[in-house]
């Protein structure tokens, strides 16, 4: 919708039938929507391990359930490919299940459950590390929602396993010297006697105005022990 130009969007799939179905859908969409042209989308055959896309050419890349389907080595390569094709400061936007509980091997090795976006779920810290290890300097966790329960009656597990769904943007910013900036919803409000507070590290807090801060900055502000920052 926001890229109404020829080949403004690139769609990649490894299955010929899926590519053909997409072409038919775009032709139908063009007939029903006067603003849409099927050539807005350039469909290419390829896979996540070797994207048929030039280096540093994409503003926004998107995926759904990549982390759940792939195992560690393939996942590392797929993330590296996303990083390669993004422009500097480009964004990889994602939606994936996550789970803070350990999963047994029966669950982890069940290809059907992985394909259903269930048993490949990673803890959030591990999820974020995969992204920062690839070079993404800024990570924004934009939403966390309940997703599924794996119970002993229907799945090979001895305990209830709670799975969340998260929405994340990984931004191809340079990696800061003191480590990545990971945003998980924290904010700071300065309410002191001055017009603003400057931490001399790039953060200026205007009086009584909330500002989103990364976890690293939140810890640094808390360590100051000030009674005029919330």
Stretches found by the model and what they are:
Residues 119-141:
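Short alpha-helix
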Residues 134, 140-146, 151-230:
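C-terminal lobe and adjacent flexible extensions of AdoMet/dcAdoMet transferase-like proteins
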Residues 59-74:
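A short SAM/SAH-binding and catalytic strip from SAM-dependent methyltransferases
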Residues 98-118:
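Short, glycine-/aromatic-enriched active-site segment of Class I SAM-dependent methyltransferases
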Residues 49-61:
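A short acidic, Gly/Pro-enriched loop at the edge of an enzyme's catalytic core
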Residues 76-91:
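A short glycine-rich, Lys/Arg-flanked "PGG" loop and its adjoining helix->strand segment in the class I
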Residues 65, 81-83, 131:
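Class I S-adenosylmethionine-dependent transferase superfamily signal
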Residues 1-50:
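Class I SAM-dependent methyltransferase SAM/SAH-binding core
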């Amino acid at each position: 919708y926001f890229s109404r130009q020829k080949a403004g969007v690139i769609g990649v799939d490894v299955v010929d039938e899926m590519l053909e179905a997409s072409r038919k859908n775009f032709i139908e969409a063009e007939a029903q929507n006067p603003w849409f042209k099927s050539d807005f989308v350039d469909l290419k055959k390829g896979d996540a391990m070797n994207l048929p896309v030039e280096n540093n050419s994409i503003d926004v890349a998107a995926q759904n359930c990549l982390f759940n389907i792939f195992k560690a080595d393939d996942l590392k390569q797929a993330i590296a490919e996303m990083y390669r094709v993004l422009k500097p400061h480009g964004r990889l936007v994602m939606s994936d299940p996550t789970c803070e509980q350990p999963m047994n091997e029966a669950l982890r090795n069940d290809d059907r459950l992985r394909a259903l976006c269930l048993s490949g779920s990673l803890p959030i810290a591990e999820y974020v590390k995969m992204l920062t290890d690839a070079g993404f300097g800024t990570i924004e966790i934009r939403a966390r929602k309940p997703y599924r329960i794996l119970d002993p009656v229907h799945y090979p597990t001895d305990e209830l396993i709670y799975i969340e769904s998260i929405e994340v943007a990984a931004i191809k910013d340079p990696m800061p010297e003191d480590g990545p900036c990971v945003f998980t919803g924290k904010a700071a409000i300065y309410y002191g006697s001055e017009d603003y507070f400057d931490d001399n590290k790039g953060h200026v807090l205007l009086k009584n105005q909330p500002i989103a801060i990364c976890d690293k900055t939140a810890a640094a502000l808390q360590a100051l022990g000030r009674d005029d920052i919330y």
